[in-house]
């Protein structure tokens, strides 16, 4: 056998310990981790199929049911970010040829439409300008025209800062034999949502926003109507990894002995459990109130600086992610860079249809405090003094 030699030397960078900066993350996510969640990341590993792990998973299911306000048995966490939860929903609910109605008033509706197209669904996007929302009348007209099996709406559109009203949409969809799928990645814990009472058939969210857990896990729940559609599929879902019937088993949702499907992110699940425990300790209503009050404080401080909010109707503003019109004679990148380099605070620019139009400020979970707002206002005041472009 021919001898072999190493062609790649040990990287010098990996001889040094990892060192990361301490920053205040006031962008649209991820968010800073509270001490209890941070400590969960340092717990010792256990097996992903140990009884103790199943107990943690069962507690997470209860936490999701509380956060979503649902009694759905088919409730679980997905091993992946919010995008993974979106694809889990669509891969299991849609089959080729199904009509899919999509609220596309920001990047998340655009993404949902693209995934639907990849599945082979007949996608009907309801395209609206960024900053807009959907009314019951608008949606009913499209339901009557296209007769979809599924409607997608984004509750908290973090690319535009819009909070989509949800009351009445579940009942409307069911009247037209359509299921309602809602993205609450940016809104969960920060704005009221009632899955069962609002007739939402599939609701998903992410770990790294107002829940203040690391990215990498997402939350999802299915109504009995949605479960029936999934279990009556004529074709297998495109993804084995995201097959809900298989995920239901490892999460103890089907009443059968749990079997191996994939290796779940044990430490990430520990962190998610602790983040949900913190939400339970605080209480949903207090969390919603705190986000609302701190967002109002942010609006006042921004207006004192002469900045304009992108979403004009206060009732439609997402309290967790605020969009601010980039002022004339400024480049958004300059403001973002100045605030980061001089104050160690992250904010971001727009995304998708709001790119180059807005700055985005996140007040997520433990980061939603008046003190953080005041600290950011100081940073923005200085940035506006130093970043103006010449009008010549």
UniProtKB/Swiss-Prot annotation:
Signal peptide annotation: none
N6-(pyridoxal phosphate)lysine PTM sites in chain numbering: 209
Motif annotated as Microbody targeting signal, chain positions: 390-392
GO MF assignments: alanine-glyoxylate transaminase activity; L-serine-pyruvate transaminase activity; protein homodimerization activity
Residue numbers of N6-succinyllysine PTMs: 225
Protein function: Peroxisomal aminotransferase that catalyzes the transamination of glyoxylate to glycine and contributes to the glyoxylate detoxification. Also catalyzes the transamination between L-serine and pyruvate and contributes to gluconeogenesis from the L-serine metabolism.
Protein name as it appears in the record: Alanine--glyoxylate aminotransferase
Species whose genome carries this gene: Oryctolagus cuniculus
Lineage: Eukaryota, Metazoa, Chordata, Craniata, Vertebrata
Gene: AGXT
């Amino acid at each position: 056998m021919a001898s072999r030699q190493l062609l790649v030397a040990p990287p010098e960078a990996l001889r040094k310990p990892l060192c990361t900066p301490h920053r205040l993350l006031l962008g649209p996510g991820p968010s800073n981790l509270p001490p209890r969640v941070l400590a969960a990341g340092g717990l010792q590993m256990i097996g992903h199929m140990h009884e103790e792990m199943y107990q943690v998973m069962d507690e997470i299911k209860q936490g999701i049911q509380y956060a979503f306000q649902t009694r759905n048995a088919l409730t679980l966490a997905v091993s992946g970010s919010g995008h993974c939860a979106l694809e889990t929903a669509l891969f299991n609910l849609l089959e080729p040829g199904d009509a899919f109605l999509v609220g596309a008033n920001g990047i998340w509706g655009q993404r949902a439409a693209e995934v639907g197209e990849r599945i082979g669904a007949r996608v009907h996007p309801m395209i609206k300008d960024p900053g807009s929302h959907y009314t019951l009348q608008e949606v009913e007209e499209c339901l009557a025209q296209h007769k979809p099996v599924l409607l997608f709406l984004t509750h908290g559109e973090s690319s535009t800062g819009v909070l989509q009203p949800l009351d009445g949409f579940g009942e409307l969809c069911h009247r037209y034999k359509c299921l309602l799928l809602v993205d609450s990645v940016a809104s969960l814990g920060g704005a009221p949502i009632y899955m069962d009472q609002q007739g939402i058939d599939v609701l998903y969210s992410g770990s790294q926003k107002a829940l203040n857990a690391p990215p990498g896990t997402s939350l999802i729940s299915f109504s009995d109507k949605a479960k029936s559609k999934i279990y009556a599929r004529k074709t297998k879902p495109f993804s084995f990894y995201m097959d809900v019937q298989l995920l239901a088993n490892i999460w103890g949702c089907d009443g059968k002995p749990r079997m191996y499907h994939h290796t779940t992110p044990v430490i990430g699940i520990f962190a998610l459990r602790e983040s949900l425990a913190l939400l339970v300790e605080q209480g949903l209503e207090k969390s919603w109130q705190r986000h609302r009050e701190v967002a109002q404080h942010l609006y006042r401080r921004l207006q004192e600086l002469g900045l304009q909010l992108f979403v004009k109707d206060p009732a439609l503003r997402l309290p967790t992610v605020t969009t601010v019109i980039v002022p004339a004679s400024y480049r958004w990148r300059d403001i973002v860079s100045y605030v980061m380099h001089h104050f160690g605070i992250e904010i971001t620019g727009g995304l998708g249809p709001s790119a180059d139009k807005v700055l985005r400020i996140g007040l997520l979970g433990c980061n939603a405090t008046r003190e953080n707002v005041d600290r950011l206002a100081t940073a923005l005041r200085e940035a506006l003094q130093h970043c103006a472009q010449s009008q010549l």
